[in-house]
Amino acid sequence: MRDSTVVIRHHHGGKKNKGNRERKKEEKRRRKYLQAVSKIKKKARSNVKDWGLYGYCRMTEFGVEGGNLLEIDGSGMSFAEFSHGIEKRHVPCVIHNLLRHWPAMKRWASVERLMEQLKGVTCKVGSDDDGYAVRMLFEHFVAYMDDPEHGKKDDSPLYIFDSTLLDKTTLKHDYLVPYLFSEDLLKYAGEERRPPHQWMCIGGPRSGTSIHVDPLGTSAWNALVCGHKRWALFPPGSVPEEVLKPKGVNSAARWFDVVWPQTLEDSWKYEKPLYVEQGPGDVIFVPSGWWHVVINVDFTVAVTENFCSSANFHRVFMHTRISRPKMTQKWLDRLKTVRPDLARIGQQIMDNDERCSDISSPSSSSSSSDDDDDDDDSSVSS
C-alpha cells in the first residue's frame, strides 16, 4: 500500500512538473514574441510614437460598401477583347471568375492553411529608415494580428507585403497569372535586372497601402483569395498630388479618415473617385498612372503583380530609360529579336532623347560613368 501510495504521489508530481515546464516554455515564447514585435515596430516606423493615437480600432467603416467601378466577367472575355476594350483605354475594373481554378483559393483561405506553408518563414512587414526590409516570423505576425495590445489596437497595423515569399516557398505553385495579364514584356529585360514585380499581401483590418501610383509606368492586377478590400482610384492628373497626399497622411486608414470624406462633399472640386469593395475571387485591374489606395476590411490574403504589356509599353519604356538605363538597353536589344514592332518604338524614344540632348547640350561629353549604373535591386512598392 505504501509503495502504491508513493507511486501515485510521484505520478501526480510528474504531471505538475510537466505543467510547469510547459508554462515556462509558453512564457518564454511570449517574451520572445513581445520583444520581436517591439523591435520590429520601432524599425518599421521609427517616427510613430503612439500606434493607436487616432483610435481607428473603434471605427467599423472605412470607405463605403458597393462601388461604381466597372465590373466584367473574366470567364467570357478573350485576351484581345480585354487588351483593346479595357487595357488600351486605361479603364480600371473589377474582374470576376478568373480564379476559380487556383489551388490558392483553398490553400490560402485561412491562417491555419497558410501556417502549414509559412511557419518559420520571415516575411517583410516594412522598411527601416535606410530602406532595408524589416522582417517578422509568420507565426509572430499571426500572433500580432490577434493581439489586443498590438494588431487589434494599432491604427494602421503591420502588413505583409513581400516580393520574395512566392519564390522562396511553395506558394508560387498555388496560382497562375490570369490569362488576361499574360503578356509580360519586362521578362525580356532579364530576371536578374528587372525590378520586383510580384508580391504576397497578408494583413488584418485597417492595414493596407496608402495612396500611390505604381512604379515605372506599370499597370497592376490584384487577386484576392480571402477577405475584403476597399479601393479608391483617381485618373492620372485629375487631382493635385498635394490634395491626394496631404502632409501627415501616410497610411490607408488615415487616408480614408481624412481625405475620403472630402471627396464626398459637394465642395470637392475635383474628379470624384472610382471605388469598389473587392471580395474573395475578385481581381482588380489598375491601369498605368492611376492613383489608388487600398484598405483591408478584415483578414485578407492576396497576390499582386505589376506588369508591362503592349498597351502601356510606351509609358513604361519612357520611365525605365531614365531610372534604369542599362536594364533598358538590354531590354531593347532583346525586344529586337522577340518583338521587333515594340523595339522600333523603343528605339525611336531613345533616338529622340539623343537628339534632344544634342540640341540642349551641344558641347557636353557623350561618355557616361559607371556611377550611373542602375544595378540597384531595391524593392519597389505597389
Language-model region placement:
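N-terminal accessory scaffold of Fe(II)-dependent oxygenases
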Residues: M1-V283, I295-S382
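Short, charged beta-turn/beta-strand-edge "cap" motif at the junction between a beta-strand
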Residues: W290-H292
